Amino acid sequence: MEANTRSTGRLPAAFLTPGSSSFMDFLSDQSPEMLPGNRSLPPLQGAVEAPHGTTIVSASFPGGVVLAGDRRATMGNMIASRDMQKVFPADEYSAVGIAGTAGLAVEMVKLFQLELEHFEKVEGAQLSLEGKANRLSTMIRSNLAMAMQGLAVVPLFAGYDVDREKGRIFSYDVTGGRTEESGYAATGSGSIFARNAMKKLYREDLTEEQALTLVVQALYDAADDDSATGGPDVARRIFPIVTVITDEGFRRLTDQESSEIARSILERRLEQPDGPRAALL
């Protein structure tokens, strides 16, 4: 872009020329070096020590979908942060939870939010939930070079589909491959434990309150077996970030609401340390 536009107070011509409704396409044309995937890295000497986000879980219910994440970030065998935010609103009817390299993941979320906002301003309408999931897939794929050097970003995307009138969940791999999940999903280092917990407890007829409890139960089980996942920290008053998306839009539970769910689970775990048990038949 021309530097002398600053002295005239006018926007560069590129900003006034009709083009794609994709902000990433615009940035790729005008300042490609600003896209995360276009940055070159020096040859790596050993493992990269960077903070990593860990476990994200999601579950759908008849009125929408919930998305939650623990608060711990790790760097090797160290705890890098105890209160990291890993779940963000993407727009009014969707949210994204991040796992993987924390700095790159947060940057990707901000770019994704801007991408959706730009589309809505240019087109005068929101992108469909399917379209949003595809845009995120493209962004993850653009980070493949960094992922191959150990700096991967693997998010979980969930939202309320206003056309189908239901909640939907999408998971991804490091190449940008997208999978729509049925009922529940998890990503991150503790995902195998969280997914197993939800597998035994999930039902299609869950109420919103039950779905909220389910994801916190799953995070508790993940923290129980995965050292990189942080459980509810009562002493520091740090609890999972829990969000719900319905036909009324995105809502993040307050700290008080999250703490009430977590504390009720902790009380029950004093009697049943391994959590609720599913029936054998």
UniProtKB/Swiss-Prot annotation:
Chief location category: cytoplasm
Gene Ontology molecular-function annotations: threonine-type endopeptidase activity
Recorded GO CC terms: cytoplasm; proteasome core complex, beta-subunit complex
Keywords, alphabetical: Autocatalytic cleavage, Cytoplasm, Hydrolase, Protease, Proteasome, Threonine protease, Zymogen
Pathway(s) served: Protein degradation; proteasomal Pup-dependent pathway
Pfam families given in the database record: Proteasome
Catalytic residues as annotated in Swiss-Prot or TrEMBL: T54 (nucleophile)
Keyword Glycoprotein: no
GO biological process: modification-dependent protein catabolic process; proteasomal protein catabolic process
Entry EC number(s): 3.4.25.1
Gene3D superfamilies per the UniProt record, alphabetical: Glutamine Phosphoribosylpyrophosphate, subunit 1, domain 1
Activity regulation remarks: The formation of the proteasomal ATPase ARC-20S proteasome complex, likely via the docking of the C-termini of ARC into the intersubunit pockets in the alpha-rings, may trigger opening of the gate for substrate entry. Interconversion between the open-gate and close-gate conformations leads to a dynamic regulation of the 20S proteasome proteolysis activity.
Reaction(s) catalysed (UniProt annotation): Cleavage of peptide bonds with very broad specificity
Location within or outside the cell: Cytoplasm
Maturation-removed propeptide residues: 1-53
Subunit annotation: The 20S proteasome core is composed of 14 alpha and 14 beta subunits that assemble into four stacked heptameric rings, resulting in a barrel-shaped structure. The two inner rings, each composed of seven catalytic beta subunits, are sandwiched by two outer rings, each composed of seven alpha subunits. The catalytic chamber with the active sites is on the inside of the barrel. Has a gated structure, the ends of the cylinder being occluded by the N-termini of the alpha-subunits. Is capped by the proteasome-associated ATPase, ARC.
Family label: Belongs to the peptidase T1B family.
General function of this protein: Component of the proteasome core, a large protease complex with broad specificity involved in protein degradation.
Protein name listed in UniProt: Proteasome subunit beta
Gene name as annotated: prcB
